[in-house]
């Protein structure tokens, strides 16, 4: 079983970014995109999802779309964050922490 997790942190005030809608899309080799799962960050700004990955799933690309426009109520430039990645090991834990602000973001791959 694979695990995908993320932690969204608000760089403006140092809090956890709770209530942010997150969509994980799967993109197959033909470029066809489908929603793999949807969720929302919890009070701690986190998402966590366990799932089975088939061999075909491991050959796909994925994108995590974080809908940040509603989270920041003032004027902002970044309305959503899109991170593209792969999950090639069906038994691995994938962790994508993101520091967000109204006008920028920073991400790293954590294992």
Task: Identify the function of each model-found stretch.
Residues 2-88, 93-97:
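Beta-strand-dominated extracellular/periplasmic modules and repeats
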